[in-house]
């Protein structure tokens, strides 16, 4: 039995050998943005629209502290991330967690295992997903040499968002089409 336990401990340490802990702090607040000659109060992360990109390697652990300085409760959803053994970090408001209330903090902790690619993160409460979102880039553990194409000269994540020109409480739900 002791040999079996030693084997599993050694296997776990070997698997975690190249993994890193990637930490981010998301300060959610409201800023005034001018779009199409209109000043609009928009809820954003770290004063940015769209929010910051998170770049990790497959196998890394992620910790994102959300500091909510906005007047709205919110959650952050890691879209497309396989949250095996970390499902409580999914950020589905009122399903896997209650919203992070104004002037409160919450730290999301999860591992990115068994996948790579460009995904995204976004708010998962009401229309806040229109302005609280950003790229989540999971690179292969073995580096760019494992991609089936030549290494690009430069990488620029493109995040397309939606601007809402009405108050958060007056925004109507989309009745048809694909809205993710």
Predicted feature locations:
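Sec-dependent signal peptide recognition
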Residues: 1-9
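Histidine-centered copper-binding motifs that mark active-site loops
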Residues: 8-180
């Amino acid at each position: 039995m002791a040999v079996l336990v030693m084997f599993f401990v050694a296997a776990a340490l070997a698997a975690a050998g190249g993994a890193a802990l990637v930490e981010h702090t998301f300060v959610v607040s409201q800023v005034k943005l001018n779009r199409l000659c209109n000043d609009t109060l928009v809820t954003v992360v770290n004063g940015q629209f769209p929010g910051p990109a998170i770049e990790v390697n497959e196998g890394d652990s992620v910790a994102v502290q959300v500091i909510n300085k906005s007047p709205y409760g919110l959650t952050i959803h890691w879209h497309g991330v396989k949250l095996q053994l970390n499902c409580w970090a999914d950020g589905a408001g009122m399903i896997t967690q209650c919203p992070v209330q104004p002037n409160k903090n919450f730290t999301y902790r999860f591992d990115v295992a068994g996948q790579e690619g460009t995904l995204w993160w976004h708010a998962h409460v009401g229309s806040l997903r229109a302005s609280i979102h950003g790229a989540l880039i999971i690179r292969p553990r073995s580096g760019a040499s494992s991609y089936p194409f030549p290494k690009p000269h430069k990488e620029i994540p493109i995040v397309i968002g939606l601007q809402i020109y009405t108050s958060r409480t007056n925004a109507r739900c989309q009745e048809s089409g694909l809205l993710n």
